[in-house]
Amino acid sequence: MGYIPYVIENTDRGERSYDIYSRLLKDRIVLLSGEINDSVASSIVAQLLFLEAEDPEKDIGLYINSPGGVITSGLSIYDTMNFIRPDVSTICIGQAASMGAFLLSCGAKGKRFSLPHSRIMIHQPLGGAQGQASDIEIISNEILRLKGLMNSILAQNSGQSLEQIAKDTDRDFYMSAKEAKEYGLIDKVLQKNVK
């Protein structure tokens, strides 16, 4: 991840130093940045579970700037978002592509956002296989199963038909924030933080 900034907060007990991610977590903000893999997913899942334990009623903000990544890693985040009691608001900052766009669309209804110059891209799952023909067939069937699952969830989240999702995800399908709103992947394009 590289350099991690620290912030200093003054309290009645003196100064306290936090890494920026811990400080954001205090405000119930989780940052999903970069490629989604098992390590990143474990960190996101742990933060979501921690925030639920802290306050099961208060919303969590999941900020996404990701080119996508491993399907099963992303699905573990998706399942956790649905498992926990707080609503998870999703906010695209920069880009949400592939699994990043999928997770963006999975935020709580009415709470899926993007900043105005972000890019959102959906497509079909990528995969490859080698080995014996029977092994390749098994992997191919699993990729097709995951494609069907993800298309079904995207259709449900966006209001688009399954046929339209299948057509649009056949190749990389890029959208601006405004186009993603019209498509149904997000609910609003944010201009200013109104907190």
UniProtKB/Swiss-Prot annotation:
The keyword Protease applies. Belongs to the peptidase S14 family. GO terms for cellular component: cytoplasm; endopeptidase Clp complex. Keywords: Cytoplasm, Hydrolase, Protease, Serine protease. Fourteen ClpP subunits assemble into 2 heptameric rings which stack back to back to give a disk-like structure with a central cavity, resembling the structure of eukaryotic proteasomes. The lineage of its organism: Bacteria, Pseudomonadati, Campylobacterota, Epsilonproteobacteria, Campylobacterales. Cleaves peptides in various proteins in a process that requires ATP hydrolysis. Has a chymotrypsin-like activity. Plays a major role in the degradation of misfolded proteins. CDD domains: S14_ClpP_2 (cd07017). It catalyses: Hydrolysis of proteins to small peptides in the presence of ATP and magnesium. alpha-casein is the usual test substrate. In the absence of ATP, only oligopeptides shorter than five residues are hydrolyzed (such as succinyl-Leu-Tyr-|-NHMec, and Leu-Tyr-Leu-|-Tyr-Trp, in which cleavage of the -Tyr-|-Leu- and -Tyr-|-Trp bonds also occurs). One of its GO terms (molecular function) is ATP-dependent peptidase activity. InterPro entries: ClpP (IPR001907), ClpP/crotonase-like_dom_sf (IPR029045), ClpP/TepA (IPR023562), ClpP_His_AS (IPR033135), ClpP_Ser_AS (IPR018215). The keyword Hydrolase applies. It is found in: Cytoplasm. HAMAP family: ClpP. This is ATP-dependent Clp protease proteolytic subunit. One of its GO terms (biological process) is protein quality control for misfolded or incompletely synthesized proteins. Its EC number is 3.4.21.92. It comes from the Bacteria. The active site is at residues 98, 123.
